[in-house]
């Protein structure tokens, strides 16, 4: 299951579809690409509920779709990483889909925006702290509905029992520190974590698909999926 980024309010763009196809080919898996309702029209919890409903549908229909329930993972980039992590949390909480893995690429994890990187990168390219603040204002304009951990996974008081995670953070990204903190919190809760702290990159760097670093990191993500599906 893949949930695209875009600040919860931008619909998916072509390069993310291309990467999803690469993950499918490289990891020899089916990728279900979810088109959730975006926060410009429907704030939290609607985008999250759409993603969780899609996950439930795939789980329920796995036999018809010829999918192995033992090898269902969630993944996403940026805001999509938030949605993936939140789906993993709710699946654990409700005893729903038994996920084998979560792929979190420069994820948004914390609505408090108090980290050092959030203070440092206020005007960085493609994404920065000011845009991040506007994103949260839009996404949570109706509040968190008593489910803060599903809006911002770092607010969960219990991260135990979650599936293994690949967490990727970029050096010059306002989200760097909260992504790394989420990885460390998962690890402290007993979750197996592969943290990739990528030097010399910024949020959304892989938009430039032809760059060697983009190719290398897509390959690392694919390898992480391959390993998760073979365990």
Description of each model-found segment:
Residues 2-231:
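Alpha/beta-hydrolase superfamily serine-hydrolase fold, recognizing
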């Amino acid at each position: 299951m893949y949930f695209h980024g875009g600040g919860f309010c931008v619909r998916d763009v072509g390069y993310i579809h291309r990467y999803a196809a690469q993950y499918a080919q490289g990891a020899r898996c089916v990728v279900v690409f979810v088109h959730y309702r975006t926060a410009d029209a429907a704030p939290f919890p609607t985008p999250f509920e759409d993603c969780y409903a899609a996950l439930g549908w795939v789980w329920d229909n796995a036999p018809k779709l010829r999918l192995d329930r033992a090898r269902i993972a969630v993944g996403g980039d940026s805001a999509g990483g938030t949605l993936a992590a939140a789906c993993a949390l709710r699946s654990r909480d409700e005893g729903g889909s038994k996920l084998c893995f979560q792929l979190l690429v420069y994820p948004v994890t914390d609505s408090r925006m108090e980290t050092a990187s959030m203070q440092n990168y206020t005007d960085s390219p493609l994404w920065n702290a000011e845009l991040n603040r506007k994103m949260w204002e839009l996404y949570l304009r109706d509040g968190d509905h008593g489910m803060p951990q599903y809006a911002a996974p770092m607010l969960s008081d219990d991260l135990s029992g979650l599936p293994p995670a690949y967490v990727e953070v970029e050096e010059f990204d306002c989200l760097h520190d909260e992504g790394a903190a989420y990885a460390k919190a998962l690890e402290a809760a007993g979750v197996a974590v592969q943290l990739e702290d990528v030097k010399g990159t910024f949020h959304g760097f892989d938009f430039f698909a032809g760059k060697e670093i983009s190719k290398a990191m897509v390959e690392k993500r694919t390898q992480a999926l391959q390993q998760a599906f073979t365990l």
